Amino acid sequence: MKKQLRSSFSTQGRRMAGARALWAANGMKKEQLGKPIIAIVNSFTQFVPGHVHLHEIGQLVKKEIEKLGCFAAEFNTIAIDDGIAMGHDGMLYSLPSRDIIADSVEYMVNAHKADAMVCISNCDKITPGMLMAAMRLNIPTVFVSGGPMEAGELDGQHLDLIDAMIKSADESVSDEEVSKIENRACPTCGCCSGMFTANSMNCLNEAIGLALPGNGTIVATHANRTQLFKDAAKQIVENTYKYYRDGDESVLPRSIATREAFLNAMTLDIAMGGSTNTVLHLLAIAHEAEADFKMDDIDMLSRKSPCLCKVAPNTQKYHIQDVNRAGGIMGIMGQLAKAGLIDTSVVRIDGMTLGEAIDKYDITSPNVCEEAIKKYKSAAAGKFNLVLGSQDVYYKELDTDRAEGCIRDIEHAYSKDGGLAVLKGNIAQDGCVVKTAGVDESIWKFTGPAKVFDSQEAACNGILGGKVVSGDVVVITHEGPKGGPGMQEMLYPTSYIKSRHLGKECALITDGRFSGGTSGLSIGHISPEAAAGGNIGKIKDGDIIEINIPERTINVRLTDEELAARPMTPVTRERYVTKSLKAYASMVSSADKGAVRLID
């Protein structure tokens, strides 16, 4: 059944003369009145390298949409660079910005009655924020990301932002060497080149089905990234007419992002050792979609999904550009499908089922198309470059080696255990998360005395000041969604542990979270958090912490009676919290619920 255009409320009828006059002043031509209005939700900013190159692409998408008969209007959201906001109180604002982005998209699209959206996202909180908005609005939506940064290179070795952070804190590394690394770590526009949060989310968007193949892996500088934007423009027009003209609801976000799609996305995440932040975001997006997807599902999947792809920071051998050469996300999904670990019947924005998309785009498929070969041969140029789609370097050959290549088959998996795991115990009754792909197997079982800090800043000072020694478990409390507030990322503490050459000799646990750039025995999202009365807030220096990844447990060596009788450790830090952050803290839920706001 044909659907009424949402935009008709502001473009049709005598009483909308004023609104039509305003649309005309926005550039709408008379022949465009009554045609679908498609919002281009951009996120250009000169604060974030993952977004610095998006200033003109929105207008290219607009032109492509209007060639096909619709009207398009662009607006921007905010975007925070977690790397620049890291290590100081700026990180308090990162996670809350996800909800601000979701709200701002909802406000703009509903206020102006747009009929559909193209979401141009890229970095850490922008993609999940826009996805949350898409689920709320449930209008035809296509996502296309700005693409990953090329990996840096020094002395024939790849490097990235995390190398700069670790080496700068290592006193054995000279200032000259640090300067060389700093100048080569981030050579192009795009989101940071490892399987950090931004790239993880852009890859998961392919698995959910709201982005086209190549979205997560084609580098930002390549001409095929520009083609992806053109393809997204064509797709949103097609889907808009499918819904409003033909009444086809299969193109709507909630029809695509079903429970099965979230299970597929999480299976991919576990198989590629993605950022632990993805757990937080997928739970929040599923909450907005009203899809039945919970922490227990993640625990279940983590026990049966192997690790098929390892990328920085879990190894320095591969970066996202190498995943692209190996066939991208469809290459990993193809292996998961062969093992029966994903549901290939789910639908996608391109009208195909996941199974059909894998058949067409998996480079090991006998039916792989030429378009796929071209996408996945898109290479890094190896030059400093801040311009989107400005180079056309191609690999001569694809990486189809599923035994020893970047992407493995089930028989040659990096590990039978997946790249993420959910642990539970008397420290984390509602669960916590560890990226096992980044943990050396020699410390999957770890027991040690607690060194407790009530802030990230105190932990950094303690680590750099020599208070943390081999065998310790660093415990950072009161950094959860409510307690921070804002659930800061603990990338600096984990980087400083590595800089002190303790990466395989210490653990770190927190009710805060971690950057996708974190590796090592780093356990976050401990729920309930200290600010909600969680037992992590009762741990004292010297308490023995027991971590067992194979058994999925984390405990402090105290009886239930001892824990119940012990008071919360008082918070000694001084931290100024603004009214906006206090408002966030008053509404936010725990990490095991996705840190969504609880609003009646």
Swiss-Prot record:
Cofactor(s) recorded for this entry are: [2Fe-2S] cluster; Mg(2+)
Q: Which Pfam families match?
A: ILV_EDD_C, ILVD_EDD_N
For this chain, the annotated S-S bridges are none
Q: Quote the record's binding site residues for [2Fe-2S] cluster.
A: C123, C192
Against PROSITE patterns, the record matches this protein to: ILVD_EDD_1 (PS00886), ILVD_EDD_2 (PS00887)
Task: State if Amino-acid biosynthesis is listed as a keyword.
Answer: yes
Q: Name one GO cellular component term.
A: cytosol
Pathway annotation? Amino-acid biosynthesis; L-isoleucine biosynthesis; L-isoleucine from 2-oxobutanoate: step 3/4; Amino-acid biosynthesis; L-valine biosynthesis; L-valine from pyruvate: step 3/4
The active site of this protein is located at: S515 (proton acceptor)
Q: What class of enzyme is it?
A: lyase
The entry marks the following residues as binding Mg(2+), namely D82, D124, K125, E489
Q: Which residues carry this modification: N6-carboxylysine?
A: K125
Q: Name one GO biological process term.
A: isoleucine biosynthetic process
What are the alphabetically sorted keywords of the record? 2Fe-2S, Amino-acid biosynthesis, Branched-chain amino acid biosynthesis, Iron, Iron-sulfur, Lyase, Magnesium, Metal-binding
Catalysed reaction(s)? (2R)-2,3-dihydroxy-3-methylbutanoate = 3-methyl-2-oxobutanoate + H2O; (2R,3R)-2,3-dihydroxy-3-methylpentanoate = (S)-3-methyl-2-oxopentanoate + H2O
Record's superkingdom? Bacteria
Magnesium listed as a keyword:
yes
EC assignment: 4.2.1.9
> Cofactor note from UniProt?
Binds 1 [2Fe-2S] cluster per subunit. This cluster acts as a Lewis acid cofactor.
**Subunit comment for this entry?**
Homodimer.
Q: Which family does it belong to?
A: Belongs to the IlvD/Edd family.
Q: What does this protein do?
A: Functions in the biosynthesis of branched-chain amino acids. Catalyzes the dehydration of (2R,3R)-2,3-dihydroxy-3-methylpentanoate (2,3-dihydroxy-3-methylvalerate) into 2-oxo-3-methylpentanoate (2-oxo-3-methylvalerate) and of (2R)-2,3-dihydroxy-3-methylbutanoate (2,3-dihydroxyisovalerate) into 2-oxo-3-methylbutanoate (2-oxoisovalerate), the penultimate precursor to L-isoleucine and L-valine, respectively.
Its recorded name reads: Dihydroxy-acid dehydratase
Q: Which gene encodes it?
A: ilvD
